[in-house]
């Protein structure tokens, strides 16, 4: 008899869990919002994600978490990696309602967003690369034209029946009543899903949205992998994490410094109004000699100010040249070893950098910007290559840490 009671309790518990899950997957009467993270690689996508999360909250719509878009060498089409591969979903719910795109499409889309009602949103007409598709009498978002646009929506078998141009509305919900305008023009009853061809957010991330980084927490897989690497591969003691951006595409991007007031993530060190100075080439592409000088200076400074927690090693993340040989040679007399992952994994690099005692990143890079925001959440110190300028550093009391 006791066994039967326990069995009934177990069945009731299972039913309760099923009921709870169904309730969580019930439709949101306030509507949904999603987008293709189709601009740039992870750093750019992360900036856009924070802005899109804030935008969804301002409109009071559930954010459908898009997969991350990746471009792999030798593959013609982008890869879509589920959001929760790299980051936990639950912490985001402390800020606002979210659901993964897979859960939405598998459990809710047929009822809430049937195929006959799928509308793509863009600011104004987006022209197709295939000229025959461009009809002056029928302007279109061409939401699936090109890579990664087509592969992204194809991942979930999404096609659009028409386009909606939302100009002159915009995404800055912090300095105007823009959210109310969106809600008035696109009520959830008529537009259950706002599906944007690109992220409804600015780049670089708005200052007001940087604080949302606290809700973006690494998945258990990456938390454990990063801790394992630190424990098994790095010598005991404090370590300095660095990000070197030096691939050929970056070399070309840095050529625009001379003609720009801002470039990519430069506001993270120069300020959104350039209140901490103007752009200069060394911020974007520091020389090998400058990198070594700054590393030695940082290590010596930590030894003087934190003698009980000296830096014992350097961990390098890079898109191209990790400079392992050069750095090992330069730092060997200081008793410092230099390390990298055996195989490239930019996400694991970030998870490891986030646990370093000190970090030096690239002011212009949105990848470094992700790391800077993550470290700010935990109160960890961060610095930038070439900032402040070496000549300014000698004549001012500006502290390197930001």
From Swiss-Prot:
GO biological process terms on file: cell fate commitment; fucose metabolic process; Notch signaling pathway; positive regulation of endocytosis; positive regulation of Notch signaling pathway; protein O-linked fucosylation
Keyword list, A-Z: Carbohydrate metabolism, Disulfide bond, Endoplasmic reticulum, Fucose metabolism, Glycoprotein, Glycosyltransferase, Notch signaling pathway, Signal, Transferase
Coiled coil: none
Entry binding sites for substrate: 41-44, 243-245, 349, 366-367
Signal peptide residues on this chain, from the entry's feature table: 1-23
Keyword Aminoacyl-tRNA synthetase: no
Glycosylation sites: 60
GO cellular component terms listed in the entry, alphabetical order: endoplasmic reticulum lumen
Catalysed reactions listed for this entry: L-seryl-[protein] + GDP-beta-L-fucose = 3-O-(alpha-L-fucosyl)-L-seryl-[protein] + GDP + H(+); L-threonyl-[protein] + GDP-beta-L-fucose = 3-O-(alpha-L-fucosyl)-L-threonyl-[protein] + GDP + H(+)
Subcellular location: Endoplasmic reticulum
Disulfide bonds: 36-38, 122-141, 254-284, 269-363
Pathway: Protein modification; protein glycosylation
UniProt record similarity statement: Belongs to the glycosyltransferase 65 family.
Assembly description: Interacts with N (via its EGF domains); the interaction is required for the endocyctic transport of N.
Biological role: Catalyzes the reaction that attaches fucose through an O-glycosidic linkage to a conserved serine or threonine residue found in the consensus sequence C2-X(4,5)-[S/T]-C3 of EGF domains, where C2 and C3 are the second and third conserved cysteines. Specifically uses GDP-fucose as donor substrate and proper disulfide pairing of the substrate EGF domains is required for fucose transfer. Plays a crucial role in Notch signaling.
Name used for this protein in its record: GDP-fucose protein O-fucosyltransferase 1
Species of the source: Drosophila melanogaster (Fruit fly)
